[in-house]
Amino acid sequence: MPDVEWIMENCHMMRDNGCWGGEKQISYASPDGQYTYYINKRKDGTYYLHGACKHYGRT
């Protein structure tokens, strides 16, 4: 899995998913279109990778 900084610099921000458990979540699409990464922003302002989803069947 790529790190948060790489995702935020190289991936396309798809949408703001709002707040989940007090943390803001943003979806990013990988450059090759195979993955969606979910980045959460903690209340202290730091970011972390919450999860990823692979899109099967895309080339």
Residue ranges of each PLM-predicted region?
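Acidic, low-complexity, intrinsically disordered interaction modules
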Residues: 12-59
